[in-house]
Amino acid sequence: MYSTRGELDGKSLYRIHQKGTEGEYRESYYYVLEAKLVLHPKIIVSFQTEFVENEDRKEMEKQDCERKACWRLMEKIAEAFPRLPICLCGDSLYACEGFFERCREMGWRYILRYKEGSIPYIAGEYRALKGKEGNYQERVLEDGKEWYDYVEDIDYNGYHVNLVEYGSYRKRVYKKGKRKGETEEERKGFWFATDFPVGRKNVANLVQRGRMRWKIENEGFNTQKKQGYHLEHQYSKDYQAMKNHYYLTQIGHMVAQVMEAWEKLWSQNRQSREQRHQRVLESFKKVRLKENREEIGRRIQIRLELE
């Protein structure tokens, strides 16, 4: 969320950059950990939030702070949705014994982006065994190829982890712009840690599900930051008001995604995006809420005082 080199309130986190140099400076910022639900390729909605607050006023240690926030968030989700089958997609930060333990206790599954530095032992076992397992498979594409490999049942302190490797090689041809007609080689490679059983028939599907994390990042947070929602703007100096605005942003983005997913229906009306959103806004004004009817119906007066 919002960050600045200036001062924020006591709830904010901070980091010292370029320590011990002339360019040393302090960055203060607000941080939130968000659980998003993938309902549809075009609909990714927020369904639980955990604001990370600096209770002891120490410099933030990303790994420690974010993991602790994740444990609190998982407890919230389990309490609110005790019977909901859940598969968590996340980055390599969560590849640790504490995460595996909580998933086992809650009966949840996981597909995590994995990097060698997360748990080096798992990477070492994978490299030692993958050539012996014979699970490598390759598929030829029109513009290149992609391949999969995996090793099942790597024992890490009693937790059985399956590691999946995905790689691709493609030739990209520029069709527009200054580089039109030029060819560029593109190589990608990712590892995923999961507790789902892995086989030749489902390995591609598991990789696709694991890559949902990027969809959440790109179509969720990046959309809110860069496409009109201005999530990183400080809308208020009051911490609670800022949190309220964040929640409203999540609701607004959810409504917008549902609208855009109904593209075929809206195309018949031939209206711009702004016009469609305005129509939805007007429809909200006509809805009578069942909750707190007495408070809504009570006459009030708002007086503004100029200083």
Label each residue range with its predicted role.
Residues M1-P41, Q48-E50:
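Active-site-proximal, Lys/Arg-enriched surface segment
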Residues G23-E27, K180-E184, Q234-Y246:
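Structural motif
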Residues D56-R172:
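An internal, acidic/charged active-site-proximal segment
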Residues Q137-I154, K225-Y239, N244, T249-E307:
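A short, flexible helix-boundary coil/loop motif
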Residues R200-Y235:
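Short amphipathic alpha-helical "interface-anchor" segments enriched in bulky aromatics
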